């Protein structure tokens, strides 16, 4: 069997996550860019997102972000619009929840935008609360049965 002469495996190539804790500068949209909220993930590096201008677009996740920045339904993203295709866009940046809150406070995002509530996970809490409500009977009602 040949000798293993490598310098480490998969975890060495990944590196350390020291940059995750650092705060980054807030990025505002420029010409040809728009904020959007992810509706659902489609696979193959694509997602469906509702842009702030009211258009539903098919978004392509860049190779730089692919498998490094995880995007889920409900996340706020910055997309670059295409000049030649209005129904498609490219994901430029995923906004962290605190950045999205700041943008909403600055008025960049509309007030009706729901933050930190994924389409798949949102709305289930209300249904769970109603499922745990019990019907209480008094002694008189039990005697009638």
Swiss-Prot record:
Positions with biased composition (Basic and acidic residues): 16-25
UniProt cross-references to Pfam families, sorted A to Z: eIF-1a
Keywords: Initiation factor, Protein biosynthesis
Molecular-function GO terms, alphabetical: RNA binding; translation initiation factor activity
Family matches, as SUPFAM superfamilies: Nucleic acid-binding proteins
PROSITE patterns: IF1A, S1_IF1_TYPE
Region (Disordered): 1-25
S1-like domain boundaries: 22-96
Biased composition regions of type Basic residues, renumbered to the chain: 1-15
Family named by the database record: Belongs to the eIF-1A family.
Role description: Seems to be required for maximal rate of protein biosynthesis. Enhances ribosome dissociation into subunits and stabilizes the binding of the initiator Met-tRNA(I) to 40 S ribosomal subunits.
HAMAP family: aIF_1A
Name this protein carries in UniProt: Eukaryotic translation initiation factor 1A
